[in-house]
Amino acid sequence: MGFALVLIFLFGFYLFLMKSSSIFPQRPFTFLYDLWVLLLVLRFLFSLIQILILCLFNFRFVEMTSNNKKKKTELCDLPKCLAPHILSWLPTKTAVTVSLLFMKGWWRSEMKNLSSLKFSFSDDQEEEHFVRFVDQVLRQRGNRKLDSFSLTLNDEIDGGFVTHLVDYPLDNGVEKLKLSIYDIKGNFQLSSRVFSQATLVTLKLATNRSLIWINGDDVAAAHLPCLKTLWLDDVLVADVKVFVRLLSRCPILEELVMIDMKWHNWEACFVVSASLRRLKIVWTDYVEMDEYDRCPQSVLFDTPNVLYLEYTDHIAGQYPLLKFSSLIEAKIRLEMIDEKEEEDEGQEVIVGDNATAFITGITSVRKLYLYANTIQVLHHYFDPPIPEFVYLTHLTIQSDKELGWDAIPELLSKCPHLETLVLEGLFHLATDVCGDVCPCRRNMEQAISYLVKSPVTHLEIYEGVVGKKRGEVTEDAARFGEQVRWFLMRMLHLQQVKIYGQTEDSVTALYDIATELRRLEGKASPNVQISVLQA
C-alpha cells in the first residue's frame, strides 16, 4: 500500500513537470520507465535485507532455545538421589518454585520426599495466602519422616493455625526443630509434646515479649533422650525447678544456649548437666541488663565436662558450686549493680558481694576473653588476691575509655604460662594503680615491673580510629604509639607484635607509627617483629 502511494505521488509529480517545462519533449515516458526500474531494484534490495534479518533472528532464537533446553536437560539429568537433598537446603517456598518451573516428571514428585521444611511469614505477605500455601505443601508431602522443620513468624498470624502447624513435625518424627515466634495473635501455647519428642536432636526456641513460656506442666512428662542442642532465646521459664527438670530429661545434651534468660527473680539459678560440652548464657543488649535492679540470688554450675563457656550476668549473691574442671575457652562479662538499700516497695535489693568464687572456678581455662566490665569487677569486687591461671596461654582484654586497667597488673602476674596477649583497644581511664602496664600512671617510681616479668611472646593490639586522612597523626594516634612503645621497652620475651587498624586510613597512620617503632632503640626484645594489618 505504501509502495503504491509512493508510485502515484512520483507519477503525478512527473506529469506536473511535463506540463510546466520542456525537459523531455520527445520521450515523455522514458523518465517514468527508468524510475519504475529503479523502484523495483530498491524493492528487491529491501526484501533481501528483510530476509537476511529474519534468518539471523531465527538463528539466534534457535540457539537460545537450544541452550535453554540444554540447561533444563542438564538440571533434569541430575541423579534422582540429589533432588530432595538440593531442595531441602532451600526455603520451602523457593523449593516449590524451583520444582514447578525447572524440574519435570519425577522431580516434581520428589517434593513429596522433602526431608526439610522452612517456612517464614513477615509483614509483606498475606496471611490467607501463606496459610493456603503451607496447607498445600503439607497435604502434598503427607505423613513422611521429617528431618528438619523451621518456622519464623515476624508478623501477626493466627495462634490456632500455628499450634496446628507445630503438631505436623511432631507427628512425623522431626529431628531438628526451630521455632522463631516474634509476633502472633489470639491464643497460642507451645505444645508440651515438644519436650517429649524422643526423636529430637536439636531444639531451638526463639521469641520476644515472652510469647513462648515453659511451666511445670510442660516438663512434667519431658523426655528428650536424643537431644544434643537446646537453644532458648528470650523464652520465659517459670522457675528453677522447671529448668532443672528440663535439663535432667536431656541425658546426652552437649550444647546449651540461653539468651536473655530472665532468671533474676528465681530463688536460685542452677545449671546441672554432666554431658554438656558448650554453655552460652548471654544478654544480647547491654541496656536490657540495666533494666534489672537485682542480681541473681544464687548461681550454681555443675558442669564438669564443659569445654567452652560464654557467660554474661550481674554478679550473683553467691556461687555455692562451680564445676568447670574441663574448661578450655571462656568469654566472661560480669556486671556490677548499683547498691541500694531498699526498693520503692520496701523490699531488700540483693547485691553481689564479690566475684571471687566465680573467677576461682574457671582457673583451669586455657583461652580467656574478659570484657572491660569484668576487669572492673576484678578490681572492685575481688577481696582476696586473684587466683593463679596455671593453664592460661591466650588472654584477650577489652578496653573502655571510661573504665580503668586497675586489675590488669595483678592479673598478668597470675598467668605464668601466658603466651599471647590480645588488647582490644588501648585507651582506658587513667588511674594511680595501673602498675607499669601503661605510661599514664601518676606514681611511676613505685611501679612494680609486671610487664618485665611477663612471659608473653605474642602481642596483638586492636585500635579504634587513628586519623581520618592519609598520614594524619591525631592525639589518639600519639597516645596509641606511646602505649605500644611502652610495651616494647619493657616486655623481655616479645617475639611478635601485630597491630590491627579498623579502616584503611587508620592502617596508613599505623604504618607510620610502626616504622618509628622499628627504629626505636633500647627495645627490651631487640628482634621483635612488628606488623600492621587491617582488622
UniProtKB/Swiss-Prot annotation:
Cysteine-cysteine disulfides: none
BP GO annotations: protein ubiquitination
F-box domain: residues covered: 73-119
Gene Ontology, cellular component aspect: membrane
Organism lineage: Eukaryota, Viridiplantae, Streptophyta, Embryophyta, Tracheophyta
Oligomer status and interactors: Part of a SCF (ASK-cullin-F-box) protein ligase complex. Interacts with ASK4.
Location of the protein in the cell: Membrane
Organism: Arabidopsis thaliana
Coiled coil regions in record: none
Function: Component of SCF(ASK-cullin-F-box) E3 ubiquitin ligase complexes, which may mediate the ubiquitination and subsequent proteasomal degradation of target proteins.
Name of the featured protein: F-box protein At1g56610
UniProt remark on domains: The F-box is necessary for the interaction with ASK proteins.
Primary location recorded for the protein, binned into one broad class: membrane
